[in-house]
């Protein structure tokens, strides 16, 4: 089937699920490893094709509302799941264009030994930009599959000097393999080994504290047990415990990823009856009479009241 016809078929399909959108949006083909059994298009754990389209659609709706406010005219807003995934993968299009023109991608993990073709390879664990990002073993990796840290080596020699000095290997600064950005890209495998010879001696939290204090971009690989029970995440409202009352009890979920300084909760059923009716011209006696006669109900919560949102037990 011709490519153009195939793309039209994909866009007209009404049977999209989240992984289908990841696949059609270019995410799966660019994710994973390039050799061995893991060399298959891989789904991201993030719901790139599900929540993401809804967020993009919200941005479109807000833009349309702003346009209406300025022009007085409404508009239709269209958002496909495929387009939303493509937008988050836009850096991969940049990489494809670079490959079209350069014939190779120096910032990819497989450089310089890869047999380059017409299509960008899978990114493995590289950072998306022109820096050298990689996942390194930390102390305890033999028994903990997530005992790792992610470290970014920025392009500047100053950044490399900070890494070399902090890790106790100033000789790396003058090592010909790492003398500048181009040489570090050409000798990534050796660079990975050097850095990991240091990281493997410390746990991921120690590494994050030590390297972070030196201005090195670093972060621990957190598993979901750590995230669920992280004291800071539970304290600041990133993870919230909601009390649904009744038989449902309490449960944890992810809170809003942003905060508003003047946030107010949604009102309970009937909570604003007096204010609304007063704004329509009803006086207090009339409102009270309507309430007594059952025309309107007294303010009440739902049958399984969410009595509070607890930001930590």
Show which residues each predicted segment covers.
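Active-site-adjacent "lid/gating" segments in soluble enzymes
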Residues: 1-147, 162
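Flexible, small-/acidic-enriched active-site or ligand-binding loops
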Residues: 42-43, 244-291
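Flexible, acidic loop-helix segments that line cofactor/substrate-binding pockets
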Residues: 75-77, 106, 114, 173-198, ...
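Amphipathic terminal alpha-helices
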Residues: 285, 289-313
């Amino acid at each position: 089937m011709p490519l153009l016809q195939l793309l039209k078929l994909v866009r007209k399909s009404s049977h999209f699920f989240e992984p289908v959108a990841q696949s059609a949006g270019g995410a799966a083909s660019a994710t994973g490893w390039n050799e061995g059994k893991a060399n298959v298009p891989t789904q991201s754990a993030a719901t790139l094709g599900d929540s993401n389209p809804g967020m993009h659609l919200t941005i479109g709706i807000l833009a349309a509302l702003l346009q209406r406010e300025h022009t007085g005219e409404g508009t239709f807003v269209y958002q496909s799941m495929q387009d939303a995934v493509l937008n988050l993968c836009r850096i991969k299009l940049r990489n494809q264009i670079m490959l079209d023109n350069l014939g190779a991608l120096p910032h990819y993990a497989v450089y310089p030994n890869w047999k380059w073709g017409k299509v960008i390879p899978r990114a493995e664990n590289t950072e998306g930009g022109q820096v050298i990002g990689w996942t390194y073993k930390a102390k305890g990796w033999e028994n903990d599959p997530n005992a790792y840290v992610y470290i970014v080596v920025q392009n500047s020699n100053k950044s490399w000097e900070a890494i070399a000095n902090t890790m106790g290997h100033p000789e790396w600064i003058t090592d010909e393999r790492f003398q500048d950005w181009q040489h570090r890209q050409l000798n990534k495998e050796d660079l990975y080994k050097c850095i990991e010879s240091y990281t493997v001696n410390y746990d991921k939290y120690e590494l994050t504290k030590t390297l972070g204090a030196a201005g090195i971009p670093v972060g621990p690989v957190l598993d979901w047990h750590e995230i669920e029970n992280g004291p800071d995440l539970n304290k600041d409202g990133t993870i919230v415990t909601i009390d649904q009352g009744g038989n449902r009890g309490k449960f944890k979920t992810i809170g809003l990823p942003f905060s508003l300084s003047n946030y107010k909760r949604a009102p309970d059923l009937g909570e604003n009856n007096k204010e609304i009716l007063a704004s329509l011209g009803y006086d207090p006696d009339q409102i009270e009479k309507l309430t007594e006669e059952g025309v309107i109900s007294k303010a009440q919560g739902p049958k399984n009241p969410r009595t509070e949102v607890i930001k930590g037990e």
